[in-house]
């Protein structure tokens, strides 16, 4: 009797554990019908969000890109997502490569659709030379205290050509236009999150080295003459290489220089 009771108790405890585990996993995914920006929401609520949480919105009204650019709102049916990351170390140089890691993850998923995406350094993802996604990483501090990182991504999944025409400054595309059918946002989100976290912990240990070959093999504009906007400055020259830190190595008049940030024009 005691043995049967003990066994029953173990089964009960295991069931409670499974239920609490499932609940914990569900709680890690925050869904919002509309938000100004998933990154802003994540930053404002980071104290209450667990490590590896996901903030997903059906619609985003005030998204931002790198260098404080506005991310044009293309409405529902597209992916607006932020990963909430709270690694134990307050500083790790690999954090600056997280956007590049995510760009490689996204490329691999798009390749499953039969596409050939390219990465425009540092982290824009292009299809046939047209932008399909934007990525932005931000460090969250409270005074001098490190609170975590928010890594946001916007992917055009179901956008009409008319809506894309509203993006005046750059050519853009959407997955549905490239594959000629609509895309299930939730399935795409789940795949992206699964692939992102599959190697995330390994990436924190190894850094850019882990993705270097995958990144460089998909990088466009190498060995061509380009200009890069770096805040209010413009640097022009030949894009020579991507170094071991994920930085862009350029040369001008046989003088090499390295860029850690910028926007290829």
Each predicted region: which residue ranges?
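N-terminal lobe of the biotin/lipoate ligase/transferase fold
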Residues: 14-115, 131-133, 140, 182-183
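Single conserved hydrophobic/aromatic residue that forms the stacking wall/gate
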Residues: 1-15
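Short linear Ser/Thr-Pro motifs
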Residues: 5-9, 37, 174
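Long, positively charged amphipathic alpha-helical accessory segments at protein N-termini or as interdomain linkers
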Residues: 23-24, 88-91, 97-117, 127-265
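ATP/adenylate-binding site constellation spanning eukaryotic-like Ser/Thr protein kinases
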Residues: 5, 76, 253
């Amino acid at each position: 009797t005691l043995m049967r009771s003990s066994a029953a108790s173990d089964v009960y405890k295991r069931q409670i554990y499974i239920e609490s585990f499932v609940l914990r996993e569900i709680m890690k995914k925050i869904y919002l019908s509309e938000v100004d920006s998933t990154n802003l929401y994540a930053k404002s609520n980071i104290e209450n969000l667990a490590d590896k949480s996901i903030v997903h919105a059906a619609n985003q009204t005030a998204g931002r890109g790198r260098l404080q650019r506005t991310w044009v709102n293309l409405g529902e049916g597209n992916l607006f997502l932020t990963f909430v990351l709270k690694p134990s170390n307050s500083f790790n140089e690999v954090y600056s490569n997280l956007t590049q890691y995510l760009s490689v993850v996204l490329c691999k998923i798009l390749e499953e659709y039969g596409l050939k995406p390219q990465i425009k350094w540092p982290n824009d993802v292009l299809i046939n030379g047209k932008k399909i996604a934007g990525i932005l990483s931000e460090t969250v501090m409270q005074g001098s205290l490190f609170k975590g990182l928010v890594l946001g991504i916007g992917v055009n999944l179901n956008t009409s050509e008319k809506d894309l025409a509203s993006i005046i400054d750059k050519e853009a595309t959407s997955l549905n236009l490239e594959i000629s059918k609509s895309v299930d946002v939730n399935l795409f989100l789940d795949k992206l999150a699964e692939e992102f976290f599959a190697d995330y912990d390994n990436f924190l240990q190894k850094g850019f080295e882990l993705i270097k070959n995958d990144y460089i093999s998909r990088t466009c504009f190498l060995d061509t003459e380009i200009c890069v906007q770096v805040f209010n400055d413009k640097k022009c020259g030949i894009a020579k290489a991507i170094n071991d830190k994920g930085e862009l190595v350029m040369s001008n008049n046989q003088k090499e220089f390295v860029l850690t940030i910028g926007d290829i024009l």
